[in-house]
């Protein structure tokens, strides 16, 4: 499973609708994750640049992108910012492959 974090900011219209009719937004997020074969690890609300964040586990990057696009296209959000999360083990693999790529990379104008 791939793990993603999405930071989101609601529109003023979405906030107004939630004030008038509060509901369990976490349940809605779980339904979306379930529809993609995933699960919700946690949902938190916050003050500041973003209104909340969710961490989800989904089968692959296609599912992670689909969840982000579904939320972003709903009209309820000013912003949805999604990032794949890596474990320490995955970071080690990334750094190992980066070493190989760094050795192969040639900056523009420095061709062999």
Give each language-model segment a name.
Residues 1-112:
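A compositional/biophysical signature of low hydrophobicity enriched in polar/charged and small residues
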């Amino acid at each position: 499973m791939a793990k993603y974090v999405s930071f989101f900011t609601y529109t003023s219209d979405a906030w107004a609708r939630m004030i008038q009719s509060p509901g369990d937004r976490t349940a809605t997020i779980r339904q979306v994750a379930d529809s993609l074969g995933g699960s919700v690890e946690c949902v938190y609300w916050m003050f500041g640049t973003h209104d909340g964040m969710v961490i989800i586990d989904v089968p692959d990057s296609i599912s992670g992108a689909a969840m982000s696009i579904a939320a972003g296209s709903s009209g309820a959000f000013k912003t949805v910012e999604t990032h794949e999360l890596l474990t320490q083990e995955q970071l080690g693999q990334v750094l190992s492959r980066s070493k190989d790529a760094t050795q192969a990379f040639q900056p523009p104008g420095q061709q062999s």
